[in-house]
């Protein structure tokens, strides 16, 4: 499956300054651009369009991605990350694990008394007990480390996450 459009934000400036963007397939872009030159396509206000600070941060971030080969680095770490994530299979309460690149989603079994409670407890324990920042949605733990992560840090992240998952079982 290939998306027609992709929206993105934080990663374009490393989260330093608010900025986002949209990538569209050529045929979609061309459809928007068919109007007269004086007609603004996708008009929605543009309060912060081309903000100089955000654009400077975005360009600097893109330079770092390129100069430090961060995309290649992340691609090389994919197997290590996936293996570490999949090692959590079989832990109590883990229903499913999905990875793509350096992103993982871990579905936890809901507690009978309250949906989302197990993942919420995991988020609290991860932060307070392990110093690990995770995101949750319902009973799903989502995690994506920075692109500068090392293999050793990936191991540390998933060791901490395993302790958290066992603690909330």
Task: Show which residues each predicted segment covers.
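Conserved N-terminal phosphate-binding loop of PLP-dependent enzymes in the Aspartate aminotransferase
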Residues: 1-169
């Amino acid at each position: 499956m290939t998306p027609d459009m992709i929206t993105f934000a934080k990663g374009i400036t490393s989260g330093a300054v608010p900025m986002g963007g949209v990538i569209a397939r050529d045929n979609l872009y061309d459809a928007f651009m068919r109007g007269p030159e004086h007609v603004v396509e996708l008009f929605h206000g543009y309060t912060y369009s081309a903000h100089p600070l955000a654009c400077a941060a975005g360009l600097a971030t893109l330079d770092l991605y390129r100069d430090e080969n961060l995309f290649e680095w992340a691609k090389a770490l994919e197997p290590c990350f996936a293996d570490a994530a999949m090692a959590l299979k079989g832990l109590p309460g883990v229903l499913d694990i999905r990875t793509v690149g350096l992103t993982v989603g871990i579905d936890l079994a809901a507690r009978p008394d309250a949906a989302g409670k197990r993942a919420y407890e995991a988020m609290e324990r991860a932060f307070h007990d392990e110093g690990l920042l995770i995101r949750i949605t319902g009973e799903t733990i989502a995690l994506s480390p920075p692109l500068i992560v090392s293999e050793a840090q990936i191991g540390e992240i998933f060791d901490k996450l395993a302790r958290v998952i066992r603690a909330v079982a």
